[in-house]
UniProtKB/Swiss-Prot annotation:
This protein's encoding gene: fliW2
Statement: the UniProt record of this protein carries the keyword Protein biosynthesis: no
Localization, UniProt: Cytoplasm
Family: Belongs to the FliW family.
Name the UniProt record assigns to this protein: Flagellar assembly factor FliW 2
Upper lineage: Bacteria, Pseudomonadati, Thermodesulfobacteriota, Desulfobulbia, Desulfobulbales
Length: 151
C-alpha cells in the first residue's frame, strides 16, 4: 500500500488498482495515474484523484444519466491505447464542472473512454460533433401536484 496526502485527507491506495491514462488528460499529459474515490453519497457523480499531482482531482459522471442519446464509439487509436478489442466492455465518462454559481456543466466535447478490463482510460477530443466543453445539465420540469378529494 502507498499513501498520498490530498484535499480529501491522507489516502491509502494499492498501486495495482490505479486507473491509468496512458496519454494523460487533455492539456495535462503528466497526469496519468488516478485513484477512483469511493462515493460517499448516493448519486451519479464520483471523484478521481491524481497520484501524480495530489492537488488535482476531477469529478466524473456517466453522461447518459443526463443525455441518454449521447453515444461515443472508440476508434482504432483508442482500442490500441486501451489495449482492448471490439468485444471488450467500455464506458463513457464526462468531466463535471461545478462553478461557484452551482450551474453544473459536463464536458461532452472531450469524453473519457474507460475499460474495466485493464483499468485504463483515454480522453478523446471529438471534432465537428457540436458538443461543448460546458454543456449545462438539462432542466427538469416540475409537475404540478394536484390533490384529489374524494367526495
Amino acid at each position: 500500500m502507498n499513501t498520498i496526502k490530498t484535499r480529501f485527507g491522507v489516502i491509502d491506495y494499492d498501486p495495482a488498482n490505479l486507473l491509468l491514462f496512458p496519454n494523460g488528460l487533455v492539456g495535462l499529459p503528466h497526469l496519468r495515474n488516478f485513484i477512483v474515490m469511493p462515493n460517499k453519497k448516493e448519486g451519479p457523480l464520483f471523484w478521481i484523484q491524481s497520484v501524480d499531482d495530489p492537488d488535482m482531482a476531477f469529478v466524473l459522471t456517466d453522461p447518459n444519466n443526463f443525455f441518454p442519446d449521447y453515444q461515443i464509439q472508440p476508434g482504432k487509436d483508442e482500442h490500441t491505447t486501451l489495449g482492448i478489442s471490439g468485444s471488450d466492455e467500455y464506458f463513457i465518462l464526462s468531466v463535471v464542472t461545478v462553478p461557484a454559481d452551482q450551474k453544473i456543466t459536463l464536458n461532452l466535447a472531450a469524453p473519457i473512454i474507460f475499460t474495466p478490463t485493464n483499468n485504463r482510460a483515454v480522453q478523446v477530443i471529438l471534432g465537428g460533433d457540436g458538443y461543448s466543453t460546458k454543456t449545462p445539465l438539462p432542466t427538469v420540469k416540475r409537475h404540478e401536484r394536484r390533490s384529489v378529494v374524494n367526495e
